[in-house]
Regions:
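Conserved coil-to-alpha-helix start sites within the AMP-binding
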Residues: 104-110
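PLP-dependent aminotransferase class I/II
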Residues: 47-52, 56-62, 135, 139, ...
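Structured binding elements
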Residues: 117
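Active-site phosphate-binding strand-loop segment of PLP-dependent enzymes
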Residues: 128-212, 217-219, 224, 407
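N-terminal "arm"/small-domain region of PLP-dependent enzymes with the aminotransferase-like
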Residues: 1-39, 405
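Short beta->alpha connector loops at strand-helix junctions that form conserved
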Residues: 103, 121-126
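Phosphate-binding glycine-rich loop
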Residues: 42-98, 112-114, 122-124, 191
Length: 427
């Protein structure tokens, strides 16, 4: 139970969850774009970002786009056309079709399915990595055997059980779209995330492991797909002497100015990952003895990028906490705490934490969408049926988990104070 009388000293400057870390070369590349007047969506910076993405991630083709969401959208369009054929103008490539997707993720993973008229089917999470559960995915194919597309995200920079998941996807003749927006630089059995799917995405949003303030990249080994994305992202203009359009296009290309920032960030990817890992290890050591554990990882097979350090409170150490759609309340209890209390305590010293992603099947906009757990339809179970166990894994992690300040500019002294605040919540 956190007491206001603890009087922890506030940080003069806010300690952020994860903010951009600049090094110097970024501004030089931005100046280069300005001084050469390459300020639009073509230029050397863009070319270099695409080259560096292929080099660092290990794919054959990269297309720099305005956001990771843009890449996911065009990935869904590609996958939909491959699976179901070209739609008529005004109709999405996934119209009326189900798409399996990660449940515990940010909505940017899921929304592109809906952009193309598809119906997301949410697959429950597993406790080992907090990612899509292969057993639940297999069950989903039993229930909806005609589904041809699966979207998988790697939560907070930790690779999921991608080999097992991919084997299931291939067995059922489906297409994997990989969302590596949070996991750039992470590897599974030595292979970079962002290369396991046929169509893949990384993000350069302001809070990511490297950033351009915005932006993302479409990654693939399929040259034809890369060319199609490049065309669609520039309004699908045909190679004619006039403005001619035979397909629906989008204004999704990355600015050469933004690309200058991304270009300057790429050489620091490994350094940023090392800093994030040190933060994770300091939390892990500092929180020993508390009834909490850090976000889990399969270190035998994968190397995360440690983007965000998270914790989950032991069930018996949870005080009473009730969340509505936008409000929350909890009851302080000696020796116990909850995510809300810890987040409030962290905020009181001018540091930023956040709740775990609220699972998509719990979101009001998607509350009527199918949700699959290990034993079948997660929407169809009665209270009596679930009385003896967890309602679903994602809901449980959301209830007990939170993201800790993970900024790679945070000092050891600042982190030690945050750890002391967390300890005080369990007094």
């Amino acid at each position: 139970m956190f007491k206001e009388s603890n009087n922890f000293k506030k940080f003069e400057s806010k300690v952020w969850l994860s903010s951009p870390t600049m090094h110097g070369p970024e501004i030089e590349y931005v100046k280069e774009a300005y001084e050469t007047n390459w300020m639009s969506t073509v230029g050397k910076n863009i070319n270099e970002v695409e080259r560096l993405a292929c080099e660092y991630i290990g794919c054959k083709h990269a297309v720099a786009l305005s956001a990771g969401t843009a890449s996911l959208h065009l990935s869904m369009k590609l996958a939909g056309i491959e699976a179901y054929g070209m739609p008529k103008v005004g109709h999405g490539a996934l119209e009326g079709k189900k798409v399996f997707c990660s449940d515990m993720t940010f909505d940017a993973t899921v929304n592109p399915i809906v952009y193309e008229g598809g119906e997301p089917v949410f697959i429950d999470t597993e406790y080992d990595t907090w990612n899509m559960d292969p057993i639940a995915l297999e069950k989903a194919f039993e229930i909806y055997p005609d589904t041809k597309i699966v979207v998988i995200a790697h939560l907070y920079g930790t690779p999921g059980k991608i080999e097992e998941l991919n084997a299931i996807i291939k067995k059922h003749g489906a297409i994997l779209v990989e969302d590596a927006a949070e996991s750039m630089g992470a590897t599974y059995k030595g292979v970079q995330t962002g290369t396991f799917g046929k169509y893949n995405t990384i993000s350069f949003n302001g809070n990511k492991i490297i950033t351009g303030s915005s932006g993302g990249c479409f990654l693939t080994d399929d040259e034809e797909a890369a060319n199609k994305v490049r065309k669609w992202s520039t309004q699908a203009r045909e190679n004619a002497a006039w403005y001619q359009h035979e397909e629906l296009g989008y204004n999704y290309r990355m600015s050469n100015v933004v690309a200058g920032v991304v270009r300057g960030q790429f050489p620091y990817l490994k350094e940023h990952i090392a800093q994030k890992k040190a933060i994770f290890e300091r939390y892990k050591e500092g929180l020993k003895g508390l009834p909490v554990s850090m976000n889990p990882m399969d270190l035998e097979n994968s190397e995360p990028n440690y983007w965000l350090s998270c914790l989950i409170i032991d069930k018996e150490a949870m005080c009473k906490q009730v969340r509505g759609e936008q409000d929350v309340c909890y009851v302080k209890e000696t020796g116990k705490s909850c995510p809300t209390e810890i987040l409030e305590a962290i905020s009181s010293i001018n540091a930023e934490g956040r709740p775990i992603w609220k699972p998509m099947h719990m979101q009001p906009i998607y509350r009527l969408n199918p949700f699959i757990v290990r034993d079948g339809n997660g929407r169809a179970r009665s209270n009596a049926y679930i009385a003896g166990g967890v309602a679903d894994v994602g809901m449980d992690i959301f209830a007990r988990g939170l993201c800790l300040p993970s900024d790679n500019k945070m000092t050891a002294e600042q982190q030690d104070r945050i750890i002391e605040v967390i300890k005080a919540c369990f007094e």
